[in-house]
C-alpha cells in the first residue's frame, strides 16, 4: 500500500544557483549538499535536486505539470511581491472562479513549474460539486 509521497526530485542545470533559489527564494531548509546534488525540507516535503547538464529542457514549458505548495490567503500578496522583487519568472495563471481560491504559478531556474495555492482539496471538491455537474464524484 502506498503511504504517501516519499520525495520529489528535479534535475537542474546548475546546482549552486538552484540551491540559492530553493533556499533563499522559497525558504527551503537545506539538509545536505554536494557538488552535484542537494536535499531540502520544503514545507515538510523531501525535495532532492540533482545536477544534470546535458538533458533537454525546452519541452518543460509546454506542460501543465507542476507541484503546488499551500500558502495562507493572508500571505498571498506578500508571496507575489517577494517573487516579483526577486525577479522570479511568474507565469500568467488560468482564469479561475473565486471558489477555486488563489494561485501564483512560476518557474524555477530550469523551467520547472511551481504553484503557491491558497485552497485545499476540500475547497476544490466543494466548488466542483457545485459548478461542474458533468463530473463524477466518489467521495
From Swiss-Prot:
GO terms for biological process: response to antibiotic. It is found in: Cytoplasm. Pfam families: Glyoxalase (PF00903). Homodimer. Its EC number is 2.5.1.-. This is Metallothiol transferase FosB. Mg(2+) binds at residues 7, 66, 115. It comes from the Bacteria. Its cofactor is Mg(2+). It is an enzyme of class 2 (transferase). Residues 4-119 form the VOC domain. The lineage of its organism: Bacteria, Bacillati, Bacillota, Bacilli, Bacillales. One of its GO terms (cellular component) is cytoplasm.
